[in-house]
Amino acid sequence: MLNIFNYFKNLRVSFHEVFSLFGFFTFMTIIVQLVSGTMLAFSSVPEPMLIPTVRDEEDIEDLYTDDFFWLHERGVDLIFIFSYFHLLRKLYLNVFDLETEASWKSGVFSFLVFQVVVFFGLVLCCTHLSEITLTIAANIFHTFFMFKGKAYWFLFTDKQLNTDTLIRLAYAHYVSAFYLSFLGLLHGIDIHYDWKNEPFYDGLSSEMLWWDEALSNELTNFFVLLVFITLAFFLLFEEPEALSYEIFMWGDIGLSTDVRFYGVAPHWYFRPFMAWLIACPFHKTGIFGLLFFFVTLYYQPNLHGVSDQNSYGKKTLTISSTVLAKKNTATPFSISIDSNLYHQITYFFFIMCCLYTPSFLPYGRFFNQIGGNWGFLFSYFYVFCYLAFTD
């Protein structure tokens, strides 16, 4: 056992940094979520008559064990934070090569399944968000069937928090969560074994060795960083409740009604999607617009070209004068992203637009005009244009 510990402790891979581990942090958090969620399942009481009582007491220990619920709740926050950082980092690096097409698509599909898992979980938590989340999920399901019949009844029954609904969503939440962990594992394998899309499998032994070393190094960095974070928060906060919603609630609507703050957990999970629904005049337009967003994100490698040869014909503007090509001729060498002025400017505006769109509060119909404003609409227009056309 000591030899195994020393092996992991001393193993280093020079090209793996902490900033490259957002995806790995996400997967590790999912594993913790499976453990805490399983413990919650052991103590779950699907009795709707208890919901008003626990809401009045502002505690849910009558439905679940409180510590595991707190751990599970904070884990969702971490998964969203890590997954958004991971996605934005990959968009910055333009990881759209032939070898990474499978890993990109499996990652986007995992991100979509994660939204479904959280939807089910928000209903099961039995807070003030449960009813509205249940209604939104049922309406989304109803929209795909063009409002014909009641196909949503199989999962959401009559859109009420009754015993039948809680049991069905509990099963759906557990099955989809374990399926998400399986997709995350496949995504990690796809991203490290980049020979997946190649017609031949040469160099398999060396790539497996690289995978083992990289994974060991990621585990080491993860646990070291986790220890420092634990010590920091142990010294800063005496009670674990201090890390609850307060860390996401900087600002008070009662003091400033027009404030645009980003951290109202758990509203901020779906704030970009909620803001999009505000901008759309019809509900079905907004739902299919969200579907179009995930389709665009899913086919990023196809939109930008998955062949290595495509990178030689791009018209780019960089800081370095030696890279500027005359008469748009192809450059025979690769261009660094850090020196690509065109990429830096377009990505900067992309981040600014991404920050502006979720600044609309989830109950934005009361604080912002329906349909948004010009800046809001332009931000969404730029986001879609960046994902579709910008290399």
UniProtKB/Swiss-Prot annotation:
InterPro entries: Cyt_b/b6_N (IPR005797), Cytb/b6-like_sf (IPR027387), Di-haem_cyt_TM (IPR016174). Binds 2 heme b groups non-covalently. Heme b b562 binds at residues 72, 173. A ubiquinone binds at residue 192. Keywords: Electron transport, Heme, Iron, Membrane, Metal-binding, Mitochondrion, Mitochondrion inner membrane, Respiratory chain, Transmembrane, Transmembrane helix, Transport, Ubiquinone. The keyword Transmembrane applies. The chain crosses the membrane at residues 22-42, 67-88, 103-123, 169-189, 213-233, 275-295, 341-361, 370-390. PROSITE patterns: CYTB_NTER. Its cofactor is heme b. Its main location: mitochondrion. It holds the Pfam family Cytochrome_B. One of its GO terms (molecular function) is metal ion binding. One of its GO terms (biological process) is respiratory electron transport chain. Belongs to the cytochrome b family. The main subunits of complex b-c1 are: cytochrome b, cytochrome c1 and the Rieske protein. Component of the ubiquinol-cytochrome c reductase complex (complex III or cytochrome b-c1 complex) that is part of the mitochondrial respiratory chain. The b-c1 complex mediates electron transfer from ubiquinol to cytochrome c. Contributes to the generation of a proton gradient across the mitochondrial membrane that is then used for ATP synthesis. This is Cytochrome b. It comes from Paramecium tetraurelia. The gene is MT-CYB.
